[in-house]
Amino acid sequence: MSERKVLNKYIPPDYDPSIRPPKKKKKFQGPNGGKLTVRLMTPFSMRCHTCGEYIYKGKKFNARKEKTGEKYFSIDILRFYIRCTRCAAEITFITDPKHADYAAESGASRNYEPWHEKRLQEYEENELAERNDIPEEDEMEKLEQKTLDTKRQMQISDALDELREKSARRSRVNIDDAIALLKEDAYGSIEEEESKKRKFEEEEIDREAKSLFSSQDGEIIRRLNAETTVEKELPKPIDLVSEKLATSNIPNFQPPKYAKRKMEKKKVLV
């Protein structure tokens, strides 16, 4: 009994996958050859060419739909296949986006409808009127447009040349040289910042010194030189008192004997 899930497969040792190409699976297109089946109603009344059966508007069919490959601007034109209800002959009709309608293609012809013919005629007349209303371009306008186009083209070519020059310059530049230049720029900016900081600090010191060594009137107090200045000896307080007493006319209240003794002591000391 074979394995149900086929988990293990035997591969012989002499198997070469390159000899046997992989199988190409055919895409499943369905019973209608890849055409979609849609449910629709006939958009107009028609008459079959094979049996002459009339198919009225609004009759429901299971139609096959496909793209014709043609487009009106960007709108795809579609084709629908139906069969006659009497003889089973194939009838096709396509979409008409230009007139917002449908048109019979093969197997049947559209019945005469006066409102439809009138509508088509009005549409054609309006289209012709629009074409006639468009003024013919003047020769001067053509020349101006041509000059503008040439100017625009020159600007585009200049921009392209600049881009080419930039790319060539970049290709010529060595990576090491670019790194060295970047480093130099970085070091130069750092040195500039340091010099600015030093200058700012010096200005701050000068401001503080001016604020400290200036008087209330705003005059600057200058520092005396140590070599030119001479320190003066301060007089003793006893000498000051004696000088004051000598200059003043204060009477001497000492007794005569004490005064004589004092004078004698001074003479002895001298």
Curated annotation (Swiss-Prot):
Part of the spliceosome which catalyzes two sequential transesterification reactions, first the excision of the non-coding intron from pre-mRNA and then the ligation of the coding exons to form the mature mRNA. Plays a role in stabilizing the structure of the spliceosome catalytic core and docking of the branch helix into the active site, producing 5'-exon and lariat intron-3'-intermediates. GO terms for molecular function: metal ion binding. Residues 258-270 have a biased composition (Basic residues). HAMAP family: YJU2. It is found in: Nucleus. Zn(2+) binds at C48, C51, C84, C87. Component of the spliceosome. Present in the activated B complex, the catalytically activated B* complex which catalyzes the branching, the catalytic step 1 C complex catalyzing the exon ligation, and the postcatalytic P complex containing the ligated exons (mRNA) and the excised lariat intron. This is Splicing factor YJU2. The keyword Metal-binding applies. GO terms for biological process: generation of catalytic spliceosome for first transesterification step; mRNA cis splicing, via spliceosome; RNA splicing. Keywords: Metal-binding, mRNA processing, mRNA splicing, Nucleus, Spliceosome, Zinc. One of its GO terms (cellular component) is Prp19 complex. It holds the Pfam family Saf4_Yju2. It comes from the Eukaryota. It comes from Schizosaccharomyces pombe (strain 972 / ATCC 24843) (Fission yeast). Belongs to the CWC16 family. YJU2 subfamily. Residues 1-32, 251-270 are annotated as: Disordered.
